[in-house]
């Protein structure tokens, strides 16, 4: 990135080929005999020191004063989930740890997901997480239909807000899952000629106005879904130096920043109310129930159960739906056993 010296433009901008050509032309207009290749040769040499703005910010913070600021920031979001402050604290440490490059093997694949009515300042809260000096590394404008740009954003931005999460289509959910857990970026830079491996900095946060938005039961552990019960208090001043100094101090003293099995269980259980249920799942317990102790019931394959539902409510019957229905039965914890004709499940007709 570059910035003009003695200019009123205080922000740094990407140094792409267009910028290099402009610098060369401006220099020639001033009577300096040089070409764009001369500038490129200088820029991409050891004459220009490597600069990481995130690390520059993090490693020039004051000492932490010992007062917790991460959990109180989470508590400005009115919600009924008692685990929210601790989960947000863990996610925040994870975000900072990946800015520092502490974990190159795994990405920060967990994302808070704030669900609430319009006007509750969800997006304002997400934006307030970034310190003002690093605000250019925050974005809420990501088009998942442009996959190359999304992948490059993992290197370009430090925090990405998936605004209007419910607008991510079902066909894009698989790509979103891939992006959330992708630890590095393998792509060709703009105007580049070869594929290079680039470091991932980005963590994710998301917002939505609608509650039934999780379509993949196995993927719910990647989200910290929170129903915002009122307007988020974004009027409190945030001491960014101490907020991030706390994260740096805790990471330096071995505080766990990754989510363990217990955390994932808490998230999965809390996310049930945000799950979007398929028609098959909604009708299953209208026509069947689980067998009680000592009750034999019927042992049926997913296709047999789905055929009965098809006769009752005209649910489409095909191989893809049968495979998905088997996952639904397992998720519901319905007793199963393996037979010669495949896995069968124990149910009683209601």
Predicted regions and their residues:
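DNA transaction DNA-binding modules
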Residues: 258-350
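AAA+/SF3 P-loop NTPase mechanochemical coupling elements
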Residues: 150-155, 189-207
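N-terminal nucleic-acid engagement/recognition segments and initiation subdomains in replication
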Residues: 1-68, 72, 79-86, 315-316
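P-loop NTPase catalytic core of nucleic-acid-dependent motor ATPases
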Residues: 45-155
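A short helix-turn-beta junction within AAA+ P-loop NTPase domains corresponding to the substrate/partner-engaging
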Residues: 214-232
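Conserved AAA+/SF3 P-loop NTPase catalytic/coupling segment centered on the Walker-B
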Residues: 157-180, 214-220
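Long, low-complexity, charged/polar intrinsically disordered regions in eukaryotic proteins
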Residues: 236-271
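Conserved catalytic/switch belt of AAA+ P-loop NTPases
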Residues: 173-196
């Amino acid at each position: 990135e570059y910035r003009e010296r003695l200019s009123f433009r205080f922000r740094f901008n990407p140094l792409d080929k267009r910028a290099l050509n402009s610098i060369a032309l401006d220099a020639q207009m001033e009577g300096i005999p040089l070409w764009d290749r001369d500038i490129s040769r200088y820029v991409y040499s050891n004459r220009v020191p490597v600069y990481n703005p995130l690390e520059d910010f993090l490693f020039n913070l004051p000492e932490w004063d010992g007062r917790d600021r991460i959990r109180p920031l989470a508590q400005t979001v009115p919600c009924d989930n008692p685990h929210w402050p601790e989960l947000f604290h863990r996610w925040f440490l994870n975000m900072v740890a990946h800015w520092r490059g502490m974990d190159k093997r795994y990405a920060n694949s967990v994302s808070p997901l704030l669900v609430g009515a319009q006007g509750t300042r969800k997006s304002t809260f997400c934006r307030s997480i970034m310190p003002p000096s690093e605000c250019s590394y925050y974005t809420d404008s990501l088009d998942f239909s442009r996959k190359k740009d999304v992948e490059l954003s993992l290197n370009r931005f430090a925090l990405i807000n998936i605004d209007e999460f419910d607008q991510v289509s079902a066909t894009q959910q698989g790509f979103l899952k891939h992006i959330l857990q992708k630890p590095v970026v393998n792509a060709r830079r703009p105007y580049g000629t070869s594929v290079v491996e680039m470091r991932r900095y980005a963590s994710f946060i998301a917002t939505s106005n609608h509650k039934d938005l999780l379509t993949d039961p196995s993927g719910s552990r990647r989200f910290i879904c929170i129903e915002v019960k009122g307007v988020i208090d974004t009027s409190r001043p945030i001491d960014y130096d101490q907020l991030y100094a706390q994260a740096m101090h805790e990471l330096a003293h071995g505080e766990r920043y990754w989510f363990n099995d217990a955390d994932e269980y808490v998230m999965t259980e809390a996310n049930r109310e945000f799950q979007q249920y398929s028609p098959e799942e909604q009708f299953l317990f209208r026509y069947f129930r689980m067998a009680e102790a000592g009750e034999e019931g019927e042992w049926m394959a997913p296709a047999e159960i789905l055929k009965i539902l098809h006769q009752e409510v005209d649910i489409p019957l095909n191989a893809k739906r049968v495979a998905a229905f088997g996952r639904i039965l397992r998720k519901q914890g319905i007793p199963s056993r393996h037979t010669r004709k495949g896995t069968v499940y124990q149910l009683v007709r209601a």
